[in-house]
């Protein structure tokens, strides 16, 4: 996983291409060293380098927000994990704090896989103790939190969703009941199949614009990093 140096500059991402999709399906169907080495130039030119360029464009949004890391994954699996397949089937970009385990903390992300792309905000598995802290924070100023939710959903045009407790926690007011039911997998995510809109620099503009609208939500949950 490569870190992105945050330097101010021009837009670097020029877009993916149909060959990107061909490689992603190819590695899914032929996940072995011989096939990968034969197609390594395709990986570098059509998948890794464009993803790294998009990561650098995203990093520019965080130049004035110290403490955020922008990471770009690589295709090679960690051999220490003893996975039966040597290569991943997707690449992703992740914006997060310098934390021990990403899944317990909020992040902004972009992912490209054989079926398409996804990007947005995700908070996969917050600790129960952290969710309790979040509920207390919400209760301190419900109007401020509800405004954050409304503003985010209005700006993005998408709902903020979450995995719910089977038995929701008791909320101090009716307006907070939906949020006291949150257990994890809190997200606001765009899913797109590959199309002409994927191939070109406009994708980078679209991704950066969407992630920028999610920064206030991301900042709120970053108060509870572990």
Give the label of every model feature segment.
Residues 57-67, 153, 220-226:
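Surface-exposed helix-capping loop/turn segments at secondary-structure junctions
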Residues 68-73, 80, 84-97, 148-165:
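Soluble extramembrane domains of integral membrane proteins
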């Amino acid at each position: 996983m490569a870190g992105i140096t945050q330097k101010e500059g021009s837009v670097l991402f020029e877009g993916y291409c149909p060959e990107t999709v061909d490689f992603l399906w190819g590695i899914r169907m032929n996940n072995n060293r011989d096939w990968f080495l034969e197609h390594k130039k395709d990986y570098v030119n059509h998948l890794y380098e464009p993803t790294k360029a998009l990561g650098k464009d995203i990093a520019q949004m965080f130049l004035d927000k110290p403490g955020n890391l922008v990471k770009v994954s690589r295709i090679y699996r960690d051999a220490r994990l003893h996975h039966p397949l040597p290569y991943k089937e997707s690449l992703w970009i992740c914006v997060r704090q310098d934390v021990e385990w990403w899944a317990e903390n909020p992040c902004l992300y972009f992912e490209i896989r054989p079926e398409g792309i996804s990007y947005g905000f995700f908070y996969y598995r917050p600790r129960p103790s952290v969710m309790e802290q979040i509920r207390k924070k919400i209760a301190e100023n419900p109007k401020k939190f509800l405004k954050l939710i409304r503003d985010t959903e209005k700006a993005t045009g998408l709902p903020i969703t979450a995995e719910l407790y089977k038995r929701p926690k008791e909320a101090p007011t009716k307006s907070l009941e939906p949020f006291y039911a949150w257990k994890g997998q809190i997200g606001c995510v765009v899913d797109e199949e590959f199309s002409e809109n994927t191939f070109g620099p406009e994708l980078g503009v679209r991704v950066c614009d969407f992630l920028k609208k999610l920064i206030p939500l991301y900042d709120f949950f970053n108060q509870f990093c572990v």
